[in-house]
């Protein structure tokens, strides 16, 4: 346990940040799973609506350094490729 006030504050701040980051990371994973489910069910309209939200989440995560910006770009690109394959087939 920390004995210095600033260290105690650092611990509190770290807990808050960790909780927020965990929540946002979970939201990203959940959104990706929803899109993949819509793609699997061959529902391009629902998948596209979810994809727009997903890209927004990814951009926000990259902006706040939750994930690297190139990681976000790669995830968007791969998901778009899957979405385009379903849209072309439909």
From Swiss-Prot:
- Bias-annotated ranges (Basic and acidic residues): 1-11
A Pfam family that this protein carries is: Ribosomal_S20p
* Keywords in alphabetical order: Ribonucleoprotein, Ribosomal protein, RNA-binding, rRNA-binding
Keyword check for RNA-binding? yes
Membrane-traversing stretches: none
Q: Which GO terms describe its biological process?
A: translation
Segments of this protein annotated with the region Disordered: 1-29, 69-90
Role summary = Binds directly to 16S ribosomal RNA.
Please give the HAMAP family that the UniProt record associates with this protein.
Answer: Ribosomal_bS20 (MF_00500)
The identity of this protein, by name, is Small ribosomal subunit protein bS20
